[in-house]
Amino acid sequence: MSILSALTSISNPMKSSKSSVANGGGRLSMGSNSVACGSCGGGSSSSGTINNADGSKTTYYTYTSPIYTYNYSYSYSSSGSSSSCGCH
């Protein structure tokens, strides 16, 4: 499975959706994408960051129950991250 399809495939939006970015030593670019996580309750929020090769950090998603919003374009070399929306 490619990184892009791993990030964008969601089998059931009422279950926990997970995303991961593996070390690919390359560039990944996306526009924006919002998906409903569903049944998470109110007031929950989080965000995920990528550690860039130059030491900076890039926020690659924000989550405010029940919506995940991806909006990013970044390059990376040896860093990765994974996250889940926290629905149980």
From Swiss-Prot:
Record-level GO BP terms: sorocarp development
Annotated InterPro entries: HssA/B-like_chaperone (IPR050533), HssA/B-related (IPR008455)
Pfam families: Coiled
Membrane spanning residue stretches: none
Composition-biased stretches (Polar residues): 1-14
Region listing for Disordered, in residue ranges: 1-26
Record-stated family: Belongs to the hssA/B family.
Protein name from the UniProt record: HssA/B-like protein 9
Gene source species: Dictyostelium discoideum
Gene name tied to this protein: hssl9
